[in-house]
Regions:
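Flavin (FAD/FMN) cofactor-binding core of flavoprotein oxidoreductases
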Residues: 152-153, 157-198
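Glycine-centered tight beta-turn/hairpin loop motif at sheet-sheet or coil-to-beta transitions
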Residues: 41-43
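Short beta-strand to alpha-helix junction loop
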Residues: 1-13, 21, 144-153
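Central helical "cap/lid" subdomain
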Residues: 45-103, 164-165
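Active-site-proximal substrate-binding core of FAD-dependent oxidoreductases
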Residues: 80, 224-230
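Active-site substrate-recognition segment that forms the wall
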Residues: 91-142, 148-149, 153-162
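A conserved short coil-to-beta-strand element within the FAD-binding core of flavoproteins
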Residues: 22-37
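Short FAD-binding loop at a beta-strand-to-alpha-helix junction that anchors the flavin cofactor
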Residues: 130-131, 188-223
Length: 230
């Protein structure tokens, strides 16, 4: 699956008629009778009949713990088996075009870099820029260290792919739960099933597959499950 012109275009289209609270974190959630209540970091509260959580499973478990929400043992065991690998990503602006051939992306199986993309070629940037993903091994080794230094190392290693272009500025981001390496067999999980909890479903790429397609299909499956509950 691919969003046009960018991956976020799909979410933006779906959210046209929705109230989306961007830049807002749910600090805690709790059961209030047959409702869910979420306490937000801006001091507001949200009350809902049903809830869907799509964050990485370790973060989801931490959020559920804030409200002392106890999950069935079988579902808890399945969730505990899910594992992720980290990724250190670099977004770099260049002073000229790269040497990356069309269509503008390279996947590498060995070495500290797993992925490079020419964002100008891909049409997601109006100026020369690249995205560099560190490999799982490199990212795990560097994750608790200085990310800017790790980013510079990736840039240095990527130099042959940049041609004569030089990096003028760059940013580094670390995803602790970048890609699931052990996933659940189900497309989603209705954790409230056979409990006194209000309807609560978990979804994401840790269920239907560790790719964007898996996350989308998991979301569809969870929506169907929640819509069928009362």
């Amino acid at each position: 699956y691919r969003g046009v012109p960018t991956m976020t275009a799909i979410a933006k289209h779906l959210a046209i008629d929705m109230t989306v609270m961007r830049g807002t974190k749910a600090d805690s959630i709790s059961q209030q009778g047959n409702r869910w209540m979420a306490m937000l970091d801006n001091g507001e509260t949200v009350v809902a009949k049903k809830m869907l959580i799509t964050s990485p499973v370790p973060q989801t478990m931490d959020l559920l713990a804030t409200g002392n929400i106890v999950l069935p043992a079988d579902k808890l065991a399945r969730l505990s088996r899910i594992q992720y690998e980290p990724c250190i990503a670099v977004m770099a602006v260049l002073d000229g075009p790269t040497a990356i051939e069309a269509p503008g992306a390279i996947s590498l199986e060995k070495g500290p870099i797993s992925w490079l993309s020419d964002n100008l070629q891909k049409g997601v940037s109006k100026i020369p820029a690249v995205t560099i993903h560190g490999s799982a091994e490199f990212s795990a080794h560097q994750f608790e260290r200085d990310h800017m230094e790790a980013g510079q190392r990736l840039i240095d290693i990527a130099t042959p792919f940049l041609g004569t272009a030089k990096v003028t500025e760059y940013q580094v981001h670390g995803w602790r739960y970048s890609k699931p390496t052990v996933v659940d067999d189900a497309s989603c999980m209705l954790v409230s099933e056979a409990t006194d909890l209000p309807p609560l479903a978990l979804a994401g790429d840790a269920f239907a597959g560790p790719r964007f397609e898996g996350a989308v299909q998991s979301g569809w499956a969870a929506a169907k499950r929640l819509m069928s509950t009362h």
